[in-house]
C-alpha cells in the first residue's frame, strides 16, 4: 500500500468514500482538499463498461472544454512548405519535418503536449511510434492530429481541445480545469466533458455505459460523483 502524506490523510477525512456527491458539493469539496502549494489540476475520472479487449469498444477521440484546462499547451507540428508556414502563423511552438523527427529520436526531445502531422508526414514519423506511442503523443486521424488543416488544429489544441482515450481498464482520465477556477467554470467544463463522453459511447457496449464517476485534484483524494447530477 502506498504511504500517503500527513496532509493527504488530513484532507481525506473530509471525504465520505461511501457517498455519491452532488456535482456542486463535489466541486466545493475538491477545492477544499486542494491544499498543495501549487494550483492543482482538477480531474474527472470516468469508469466505463466497455470491453477493452474488443477494438471496436475502445474510445479515442478529442473533446473541447468551454473554459479550457488552465494549462499552457505546447504544440509540435510535422509539416513542410506552405503547411509549415500556416502552423507557425497559428501559434505552433515547434514546426519541422525530418529535423524534428531526428531530434526526438536522438535527443529524446519531448517538450510538447500535442503532436500534429500532415498526412504526407506519416512516412517521416512512422519510426517514432515506439517513442511517441506509449506517451500518447503519436499523431492519429481519430484524434484529429493527422490533418491538412494544421492551422485549425493548432488553434483548437492551443485553446484546450484534448485527446481522450480509454486506458487498459476502460477508464477515462480528463483534466477539467484548475482548483483556482471559479465553481461555475469548473461545473460547465465537467458537464461539457461528461456529455461529450456520453456521445462517444461505442455501439457494442451492453448495459450501462458509465459505471462510476470520480472527481479529484492532483494531490487530493477521489470524490465520487452522482452521475445523474452531471446531466441536469
From Swiss-Prot:
Source organism: Thermosipho africanus (strain TCF52B)
CDD domains tied to this protein: Ribosomal_L1 (cd00403)
Annotated Gene3D superfamilies: 3.30.190.20, 3.40.50.790
Function description: Binds directly to 23S rRNA. The L1 stalk is quite mobile in the ribosome, and is involved in E site tRNA release.
GO molecular function: rRNA binding; structural constituent of ribosome; tRNA binding
Similarity comment: Belongs to the universal ribosomal protein uL1 family.
Keywords, in A-Z order: Repressor, Ribonucleoprotein, Ribosomal protein, RNA-binding, rRNA-binding, Translation regulation, tRNA-binding
Protein name according to UniProt: Large ribosomal subunit protein uL1
GO cellular component: large ribosomal subunit
InterPro entries the record matches: Ribosom_uL1_bac-type, Ribosomal_uL1, Ribosomal_uL1-like, Ribosomal_uL1/biogenesis, Ribosomal_uL1_3-a/b-sand, Ribosomal_uL1_CS
Disulfide-bonded cysteines: none
The protein's assembly and partners: Part of the 50S ribosomal subunit.
Superkingdom per UniProt: Bacteria
GO biological process: regulation of translation; translation
Amino acid at each position: 500500500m502506498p504511504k500517503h502524506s500527513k496532509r493527504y490523510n488530513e484532507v481525506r477525512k473530509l471525504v465520505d468514500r461511501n457517498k455519491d456527491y452532488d456535482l456542486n458539493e463535489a466541486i466545493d469539496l475538491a477545492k477544499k482538499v486542494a491544499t498543495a502549494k501549487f494550483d492543482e489540476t482538477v480531474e474527472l475520472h470516468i469508469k466505463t463498461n466497455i470491453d477493452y479487449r474488443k477494438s471496436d469498444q475502445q474510445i479515442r477521440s478529442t473533446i473541447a472544454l468551454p473554459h479550457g484546462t488552465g494549462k499552457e499547451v505546447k504544440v509540435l507540428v510535422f509539416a513542410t512548405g506552405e503547411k509549415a508556414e500556416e502552423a507557425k502563423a497559428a501559434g505552433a511552438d515547434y514546426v519541422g519535418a525530418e529535423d524534428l523527427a531526428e531530434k526526438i529520436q536522438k535527443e529524446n526531445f519531448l517538450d510538447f503536449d500535442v503532436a500534429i502531422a500532415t498526412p504526407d508526414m506519416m512516412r517521416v514519423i512512422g519510426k517514432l511510434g515506439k517513442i511517441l506511442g506509449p506517451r500518447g503523443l503519436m499523431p492519429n486521424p481519430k484524434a484529429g492530429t493527422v490533418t491538412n488543416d494544421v492551422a485549425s488544429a493548432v488553434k483548437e489544441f492551443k485553446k484546450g481541445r484534448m485527446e481522450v482515450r480509454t486506458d487498459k481498464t476502460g477508464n477515462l482520465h480528463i483534466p477539467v480545469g484548475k482548483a483556482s477556477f471559479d465553481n461555475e467554470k469548473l461545473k460547465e467544463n465537467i458537464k461539457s466533458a461528461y456529455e461529450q463522453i456520453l456521445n462517444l459511447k461505442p455501439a457494442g457496449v451492453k448495459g450501462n455505459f458509465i459505471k462510476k464517476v470520480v472527481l479529484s485534484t492532483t494531490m487530493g483524494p477521489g470524490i465520487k460523483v452522482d452521475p445523474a447530477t452531471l446531466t441536469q
